[in-house]
């Protein structure tokens, strides 16, 4: 979209036009790096006019997932059940939030926008049900995370410990350690702790 096209949208909105958007992704991953997404262009119009869009046809609304259930059902009268579906994506504030809003299990994949730090600090409405490095791990069962005591969480052979303002893990190259760290961080935040003040591990996955 060119500057002139953006300007024409702004002029129309200033004159009272209502507008809907396809999605609100601020960024999108491209071959050469991270590029501005539709949400960044929308924000330009909002900055110029002070007027928000009336709705989004895409995520984080769950309508896209609901429609997919109907399409997948084919000629059946009932859509595919939510329990048989999995919302998959690389963005917490679109893909995962849409799944949570719609009542779907969700899976965050680390090959796109989201990084381990964002996962550990995610508020409840942005937290995925599952975490994988890449889509090849869809073929693998994800181990459960368990609290072995008040400060230590385990996932398979990996552990995460949160004490004295520091979250540490057994192996920062292990996806199970990230899963354990997320469980520890989320529990801490849900119990009223300030996860922003906690020293978090640097993962290399």
Regions found by a protein language model. Name each.
Residues 1-205:
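Asp-based, Mg2+/Mn2+-dependent phosphohydrolase catalytic module
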């Amino acid at each position: 979209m060119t500057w002139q096209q953006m300007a024409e949208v702004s002029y129309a909105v200033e004159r009272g036009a209502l507008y809907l958007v396809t999605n609100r992704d601020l960024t999108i991953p491209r071959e050469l790096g991270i590029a501005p997404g539709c949400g960044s262009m929308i924000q330009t119009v909002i900055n110029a006019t002070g007027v928000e869009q009336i709705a989004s046809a895409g995520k984080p609304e769950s309508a896209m997932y609901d429609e997919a259930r109907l399409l997948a059902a084919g000629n059946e009268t009932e859509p595919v059940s939510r329990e048989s579906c999995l919302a998959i994506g690389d963005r917490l504030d679109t893909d995962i939030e849409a799944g949570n809003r719609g009542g779907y299990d969700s899976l965050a994949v680390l090959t796109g926008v989201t990084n381990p730090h964002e996962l550990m600090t995610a508020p409840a409405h942005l937290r995925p049900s599952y975490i994988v490095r890449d889509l090849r791990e869809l073929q693998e069962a994800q181990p459960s995370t368990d609290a072995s005591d008040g400060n230590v969480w385990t996932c398979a052979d990996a552990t995460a410990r949160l004490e004295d303002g520091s979250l540490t893990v057994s192996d920062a190259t292990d996806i199970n350690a990230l899963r354990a760290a997320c469980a520890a961080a989320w529990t801490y935040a849900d119990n009223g702790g300030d996860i922003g003040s906690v020293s978090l591990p640097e993962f290399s996955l």
